[in-house]
UniProtKB/Swiss-Prot annotation:
Name of the coding gene: wzyE
Pathway annotation from the record: Bacterial outer membrane biogenesis; enterobacterial common antigen biosynthesis
Protein name: Probable ECA polymerase
Pfam families on file: WzyE (PF06899)
Biological function: Probably involved in the polymerization of enterobacterial common antigen (ECA) trisaccharide repeat units.
Native source organism of the sequence: Escherichia coli O1:K1 / APEC
């Protein structure tokens, strides 16, 4: 890449970054937080944060990258995607009418809410316990990170339930919403994330998500400033780099350490070059249609229920890894959101996917606003826990693609909804057995006087 070509790419990158950052800043000033703000920051991180890192790798370490015209296509496709997404998100689908009293779809009380978070936490802890009994601490047993996907590791399906510890702790926080509950959320979820990091063998997702939710709650409540958020972001990047070194068993120093930091940080937070690789091989892609979305559900079907279930699932990430990169190491390489759309339907699917994503984020913000307006604090805690708990799925959306997002968000909704139903059933059983007694002011006064 020549300096002239880099200059042209830099101008396009700067314009796209300023365009998205400006719209995000205006939205932040208006509402302080919603899921449009979160997705916009996530989109910036995924598709634009990596460009400066790539530039340093090219000019400082002479690393090979896709041709400049392909990198230009990647930047422009990301910018156009966001423009279509933003218009869709801001388009009002129906006229605003005065809020008329409507019968709520469901309601919650204190006992049901506490039962819900206990069940969610129980699912996570039991899953971790069973996985640990089968495999021990994989971080200290395996020689390479790719081995966690091999037949040596049993009970891999249990990892999908680990994440429900975070929604459980979110319910606990939203029931109190003070600084002590906020700090308890951070300590409990990060400790759990470090535990799963050691047990699973290097998975950092729970740590990243817990830290991100902690920061956004702090921004919403005014407990941290934007400068503190930026400092925490830098600290998070350094922390993820250190965990990546431990995961891959790397011991580096000097120029090698700087080089490793650049490419690991780029691959962790901003795999935008993967989109460029897909565009570079555009003519060789056999468009998959909506099949990757259907196939991604296969991993949630137990083999005893479907004996003939394919052992290898050809979703967009695996198609990109196996068919485009010809990589059969056992690791699935992230195609990014736009890359998954390219795999499914080429350039035509990019604006269509942007419209779909705009509607998805609009739906999450609608739920979030319902929680903000809810007068029943127990129901509000459940709604907010669901919305913030889905942040993991939004990260999957930006990094892994639409197909991975759909299967995971459906799984999240089913498990979360099942926990709600079980909590309500248990409450009904306890109440029928006479074990539930409503609190009254007189009984509370008697307890205090006694």
């Amino acid at each position: 890449m020549s300096l002239l070509q880099f200059s042209g790419l830099f101008v396009v990158w700067l314009l796209c970054t300023l365009f998205i950052a400006t719209l995000t800043w205006f939205e932040f000033r208006r509402v302080r937080f919603n899921f449009n703000v979160f997705f916009s920051l996530l989109f910036l991180l995924t598709f634009f944060f990596g460009f400066p890192l790539t530039s340093v790798l090219v000019f400082r370490f002479d690393v090979g990258v896709a041709p400049p015209e392909i990198l230009l296509q990647a930047l422009l496709s990301a910018g156009c995607f966001y423009a279509v997404y933003y218009v869709t998100y801001k388009t009002r689908l129906r006229k605003r009418v005065a809020d008329a009293p409507r019968r709520p779809l469901f309601t919650m009380n204190r006992v049901e809410t506490n039962l819900t978070w206990v069940i969610l936490m129980g699912i996570a802890l039991v899953s971790v316990g069973i996985f640990f009994m089968h495999n021990g601490f994989l971080l200290f047993r395996l020689n390479s990170y790719s081995q966690i996907f091999s037949s040596e590791v049993s009970g891999v399906a249990l990892k999908r339930f680990f994440y429900f510890f975070i929604p459980a702790m979110l319910v606990v926080y939203f029931l109190r919403q003070d600084s002590k509950a906020w700090l308890f959320f951070l300590v409990s979820t990060v400790a759990f994330g470090l535990l799963t990091y050691m047990i699973v063998g290097g998975t950092r997702a729970n740590i990243i998500i817990a830290f991100a939710i902690f920061l956004f709650i702090g921004i919403i409540r005014g407990w941290i400033s934007l400068w503190m958020l930026a400092a925490a972001g830098v600290l998070g990047i350094v922390g993820m780099f250190w965990l990546a070194l431990k995961r891959y068993g790397m011991n580096v120093s000097g120029d090698e350490a700087f080089y490793t930091f650049l490419y690991l940080t780029r691959d962790t937070f901003s795999p935008w070059e993967n989109l460029a690789l897909l565009l570079q091989n555009y003519d060789n892609i056999d468009f998959q249609g909506l099949a990757p979305i259907v196939r991604d559900f296969y991993v949630f079907i137990p083999s005893w229920l479907w004996p003939g279930r394919p052992s290898m699932v050809l979703n967009s990430a695996n198609y990109f890894t196996w068919e485009v990169l010809n990589n059969h190491s056992g690791l699935a390489i992230s195609p990014t959101l736009i890359g998954s759309l390219v795999v499914m339907g080429g350039a035509l699917f990019i604006p269509l996917g942007a419209i779909v994503v705009g509607l998805i984020i609009k739906w999450f913000d609608w739920l979030y606003e319902l929680g903000n307006r809810e007068t029943n604090r127990y129901k509000a805690a459940i709604l907010h826990s669901f919305c913030f708990g889905a942040i993991f799925n939004m990260i999957v959306l930006a990094r892994e693609g639409l197909d991975s997002f759909v299967s995971r968000v459906v799984f999240f909704i089913v498990v979360f909804g099942a926990c709600l139903m079980i909590a309500k059933l248990l409450y009904w059983l306890f109440e029928s057995a006479g074990l539930i007694h409503k609190r009254t002011k007189s009984s509370l006064r008697t307890q205090v006087e006694g």
